[in-house]
Amino acid sequence: MPLEKGKGLHVAKVVEITAESTKSFEDAIALGVDRASKTLKNVQGAWVKDQKVIVRDGKIAVFRVYLKVTFILVE
């Protein structure tokens, strides 16, 4: 639900989530946004706060992202 001019005040909320993937940072972001969208209504965007990799046996095993997900509260 985009913010519409002249439609009154919208209240947004931001939650922080962590998501991970064994494939890539992009996959971790997609999984995190998909999961958040299943629980939260009106997700508007996500900001990647931080990202890191977990290394096992000298190789990247996990791509981890820390996201701030914004959603609009509905009355």
Kindly label every feature range from the protein language model.
Residues 1-7, 56-58:
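Short beta-strand/turn micro-motifs at beta-sheet edges
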Residues 10-44:
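Short, well-ordered alpha-helical segments
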Residues 52-75:
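A cross-kingdom feature marking charged/low-complexity
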